Amino acid sequence: MRGLATTLLIGAAAAATYPAQQVLKAPEEVLEKTHKTSSSSLAETLARPLHELNEELKSLTAEAEEVWEQVSNMFPGALDNIPFFSSPKKHTRRPDSHWDHIVRGADVQNIWVENENGEKEREVGGRLETFDLRVKAVDPSSLGIDPDVKQYSGYLDDNENDKHLFYWFFESRNDPKNDPVVLWLNGGPGCSSLTGLFFELGPSSIGKNIKPIYNPYSWNSNASVIFLDQPVNVGFSYSGNSVSETSAAAKDVYALLTLFFKQFPEYATQDFHIAGESYAGHYIPSFASEILSHKKRNINLKSVLIGNGLTDGFTQYEYYRPMACGDGGYPAVLDESACRSMDNALGRCQSMIQSCYDSESAWTCVPASIYCNNALLGPYQRTGQNVYDIRKPCEGSSLCYADLEYISTYLNQAEVLKAVGAEVDSFDSCNFDINRNFLFKGDWMKPFHKLVPGILEEIPVLIYAGDADFICNWLGNKAWSDALEWSGHEEYAATELEDLEIVDNEHKGKKIGQVKSSGNLTFMRLFGGGHMVPYDQPEASLEFFNRWIGGEWTK
């Protein structure tokens, strides 16, 4: 059981983040590495010795209480010393004169219009008065990234809560006056969307020589794309506080988009989509629900795309054993003994996840995350195989991909920081403090799939998955989308997978995956793609993306 406590201490949720392959560290190392001060009430609560948490523990199931007790007994002083909120990133705020535009949320909030009944109402809904949006035109030639494309970067500021979210916008290479706009979100929680920009689907990658390399398969080939670093203290974003649950970030994203489209009304009437991967399986249902809840909005949300996401842990965790043991289309990674162990652990894991679903309390959701990650992810992780690509060992750094180190080196150059207006002193691909915070808030195992039926009543949803990923594998993603209860469930469940082929270039007819679609729900399996489909299969990625935003499965 020592592995359980170690997983707790470094952030058990890191097992299913993008990217974090670390498994074992000495407790003393971890405590020293993560020790920071915090006055947060949650930190104070969780730092209390477990024997003092009598009222909280009364509500636990026996399984959840056992997990907490095991951790307490093995490391009796540990929870007194581990903080649960990250310290602010070092930063220097640039003067207002540095920015080309500043959009004041209070000004937008005070715009009133007359409705069809002759009554006065606000032009857009939501609480915006504490937010500002700072905008800087990026000189493409200064960075060598898509030099013929308009780019903007800046910050959304929540002045009341000292939160500052960084974004970087790239206009479409094709027809920016008519092409849709897409918000891209990486997961983690705690990983920068600039990783998606330079590692997966943006206009350039970064080579070994720390120079940009043109990407012909960029998603801004036929769409304008916003890459957002969220939650705060991720990438170039920063705050004096911290965010530790998905719902808290949803209102920030709504404010960002509202003010962005107010500053750039030329994009506001175009179709808008939200796309992301991994922990974005939590983010996207929450963010889309927040946007759709505002009937008066300037965000023309048309669909959402979730790639290799974690959305329904109860269903998805069942498919770690099949994927690791040879039933997912690739050779087995684990031996029969390890596979039997995972089979034996599944019942307890799902029982604990169900308790989390029923209460949505940290006191049941945290133990579910700890136990299930240790029992069902741990055996695979300990083999050293890449959790994001079952075909490969984890090589290079703890992130498994050397290219990520090139990206960090590039983004930490003074000329790059200046060109995009970054206000933090340094860039990191992932902030593991944030990852731990979300775990201990109970966010990891919460049932975000319950938001999807409401979204499906209004807009289409695409669930896509590279079939070589282990951590958020295609078996689990297909299973939860098949099981989802919504108004079109019966028709969707009866729909069979069909071949997905390239349709209109020199590779016409090439099979790139499988697809099933009915009503507003579509699932895709992408052959040969790992956790980051655009990285492994760039041509196939752009193919399905262009056809999706073009309306092939959304009409």
Swiss-Prot record:
Annotated S-S bridges: C191-C430, C325-C339, C349-C372, C356-C365, C394-C400
GO cellular component, one term: fungal-type vacuole
InterPro entries for the chain: AB_hydrolase_fold (IPR029058), Peptidase_S10 (IPR001563), Propeptide_carboxypepY (IPR008442), Ser_caboxypep_ser_AS (IPR018202)
UniProt KW keywords: Carboxypeptidase, Disulfide bond, Glycoprotein, Hydrolase, Protease, Signal, Vacuole, Zymogen
EC number: 3.4.16.5
Cleaved signal peptide residues: 1-17
SUPFAM superfamilies linked: alpha/beta-Hydrolases (SSF53474)
GO BP: any one term: proteolysis
Glycan attachment sites: N222, N520
List of catalytic residues: S278, D469, H531
Pfam families according to UniProt: Carbpep_Y_N, Peptidase_S10
Principal cellular location given in the protein's record: other
Catalytic reaction annotation: Release of a C-terminal amino acid with broad specificity
Compartment(s): Vacuole
Domain of life: Eukaryota
Function recorded in the entry: Vacuolar carboxypeptidase involved in degradation of small peptides. Digests preferentially peptides containing an aliphatic or hydrophobic residue in P1' position, as well as methionine, leucine or phenylalanine in P1 position of ester substrate.
Protein family: Belongs to the peptidase S10 family.
Entry protein name: Carboxypeptidase Y homolog A
